[in-house]
Amino acid sequence: MEKISVSAFLLLVALSYTLARDTTVKPAAKKDTKDSRPKLPQTLSRGWGDQLIWTQTYEEALYKSKTSNKPLMIIHHLDECPHSQALKKVFAENKEIQKLAEQFVLLNLVYETTDKHLSPDGQYVPRIMFVDPSLTVRADITGRYSNRLYAYEPTDTALLLDNMKKALKLLKTEL
């Protein structure tokens, strides 16, 4: 019985030593990764265009759209999503998109809203939708995919520009 107790005790000591050593090695290894660099403060743009004016919440964006009589452009994305990252890079670097975006109330969301009109064909990212100042979701302004109507790829900049212009043009003819 004594041999079993001593063996169990030694096994526990060895196991706890191994686990303790693993946790102390991991933080040292992280020093070389990009995670250890000081992070820049997060802005509302989240990298989609720092010079643009972005709203913080969906409710604030709807209010600004209605009071300013500008259409609302909503970008649904995730920080870890490679498709979202690729679209963000193209969106932020395209001068024509950035210039046209100034005529919109802008909101980018990394979470879903409670408004089911903003996900008529499912919750996927990246997804760009437009809402006019009368607070009507513009379901007619779609991307090129039939299974993800509001999805855009980095190669879809011309289509996105056309849809942004369509949102502005139809806004003027509806009022």
Curated annotation (Swiss-Prot):
Position of sequence motif Homodimer stabilization: 45-54, 60-67
Pfam families: Thioredoxin_7 (PF13899)
Signal peptide location: 1-20
Gene3D superfamilies, sorted: Glutaredoxin
Required to promote cell adhesion as annotated region, ranges: 21-40
Protein's cellular compartments: Secreted; Endoplasmic reticulum
Function: Required for MUC2 post-transcriptional synthesis and secretion. May play a role in the production of mucus by intestinal cells. Proto-oncogene that may play a role in cell migration, cell differentiation and cell growth. Promotes cell adhesion.
Quaternary structure, from the entry: Monomer and homodimer. Interacts with LYPD3 and DAG1 (alphaDAG1). Interacts with MUC2; disulfide-linked.
Protein known as: Anterior gradient protein 2 homolog
Gene name per UniProt: AGR2
